[in-house]
Structure formats: C-alpha cells, structure tokens
C-alpha cells in the first residue's frame, strides 16, 4: 500500500507585534521571556549569546509556532556573557516553572558512586566533600542503579560485586549466560574486576574543585561586566564588580546543584572566562 504523502506545512509568519519587539532586542547575550496576554508569569524562558537573532529564529518547530501564537509580549535581561545567561536561565526556570519549558527543579538529594574499601557504594552527594573520587550525579538511588546496570551490561560486570544483588557462592545467573565475566565464581579475580570497573566509571568522574578557595568568573560585553562567584562547584551569585564579588556570602554545603555544576565545569576547568581567585 503506497504511503500517504506528508501534507505540506502550513505557512506561518512571525506575529507582527512580536516581530517588532524581537527586532528591538539587543544583539547581546542574555535571557528572554515570552508572556501571554495579561500573564505575569512567562510562557517560556530562553537564553542566547545574541538575544535578537534567537528571538527571530523561534519558528523552527510547530511547538514554537504555537507558543508564538499565544505570546503577546517579549521581555529580556542582558548578561555579560554566555555563562551568565546559562546560570540565569537555569535559576529562573526552576523558580518560575514556565508552561512551555522542560520542568527543572532544584534537587534536594543527589547520589553518586564511589569505591570504599574495595566496594562500590551509592552515597548522598548533595554536599561535595573531600574524599574518594565520586562518579556520576544521579537524581535518585534508583537512577544510579539503573545506570550501573547498563554499565554492567556494556562491560560484563558482576551485579553481586557491584552490590546490585546478593552474592551467590556458585556465581550469578548473568555469569551463566555470559553477561558477567565471572568474578563471582572465580573466572576473574576481584582485582581485575575492580580495575575494569574503574575504567568503565572514568567518564562519569565528578571533577574535583581545582582551587584553594572560591573564585569569580569574569565576563564582559561592551560596558557590562559580571563576576559569577563559585565555591567548590556551588554557584553563590553574580555581581557587578570584583569588589562586590569579594564580599559574596558563603553558602552551606547542601547548596550544591547538578545543573549549575554542568554549566560551570567547562569554564572553570578550561578557563574560558577570566578566573579571579577570591582568597
């Protein structure tokens, strides 16, 4: 039976009242907001290194077209660079929960994996501390176990040695069907299994904080400057001057946030922005 031809997409033009607002936006980094008529809460929050260009490009999918039909006004907030835009967007989406954005919520609990006395453990990592290397940032213990099971399948690791299921002196069922290399029944030494496990976990390693104190990541766009203060991967806040950044408050260890870590890890490790050590 021949396939039905796909109907042509209906033409859609950028609403005139929104186009005028978009064209008036700056060609600068920052965060922008779409609002429906009469609403004080945004429909959608986005970010870009060029607010105007990104606003005018919001016609790429049917979902974006539908959102533009609902929107009545656009607002924006400039930042001094991409890092500031990413941090601001992440914070505002968590706080405001816009209808058209993927839901982001601050995680009150995070889990990671670590090796302790030759055993793999799942621990709470809402607060990062000095100690053994941590692997992965998971939103629940269940998600950590699911990820570990996929890793076990890929590398023929033993569920019992990973702590996923009880040990069996005769070896696990997965060893019988050759999904486990057999460390549970003597086909492989425990040391060899641990070495393979650590190699498999390496790409999940949580980077250690590389500075002796808090730092500020400095960004500038035109006359605008911002200093993003970070301490042990915890985002403290954004300030307009280095002097203000040096007066930034400290935060409790429980303020660690996985989304901020993912935003900050590259600029901190590779210094894509100027780093000021706040000792």
Language model segments and positions:
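Conserved catalytic/ligand-binding micro-motifs in nucleotide and anionic cofactor chemistry
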Residues: 1-43, 47-279
């Amino acid at each position: 039976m021949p396939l039905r031809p796909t109907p042509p997409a209906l033409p859609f033009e950028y609403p005139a009242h929104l186009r005028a607002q978009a064209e008036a936006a700056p060609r600068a980094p920052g965060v922008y907001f779409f609002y429906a008529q009469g609403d004080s809460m945004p429909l959608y929050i986005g970010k870009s290194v060029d607010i105007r260009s990104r606003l005018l490009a919001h016609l790429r999918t049917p979902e974006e077209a539908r959102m533009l039909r609902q929107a009545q006004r656009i607002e924006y907030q400039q930042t001094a660079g991409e890092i500031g835009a990413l941090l601001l967007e992440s914070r505002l989406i968590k706080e405001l929960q816009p209808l058209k954005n993927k839901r982001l919520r601050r995680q009150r609990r995070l889990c990671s994996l670590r090796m302790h006395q030759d055993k793999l453990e799942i621990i709470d990592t809402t607060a990062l501390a000095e100690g053994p290397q941590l692997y992965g940032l998971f939103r629940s213990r269940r998600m950590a176990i699911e990820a570990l099971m996929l890793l076990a399948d890929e590398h023929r690791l033993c569920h019992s040695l990973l702590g996923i299921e009880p040990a069996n002196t005769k070896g696990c069922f997965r060893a019988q069907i050759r999904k486990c290399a057999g460390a549970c029944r003597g086909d492989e030494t425990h040391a060899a299994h641990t070495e393979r496990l650590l190699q498999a976990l390496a790409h999940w390693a949580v980077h250690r904080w590389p500075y002796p104190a808090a730092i500020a990541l400095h960004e500038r766009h035109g006359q605008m400057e911002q200093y993003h203060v970070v301490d042990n991967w915890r985002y403290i806040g954004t300030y307009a001057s280095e002097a203000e950044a040096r007066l930034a408050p400290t935060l409790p260890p429980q303020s660690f946030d996985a989304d901020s870590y993912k935003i900050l890890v590259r600029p901190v490790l590779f210094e894509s922005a100027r780093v000021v050590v706040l000792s």
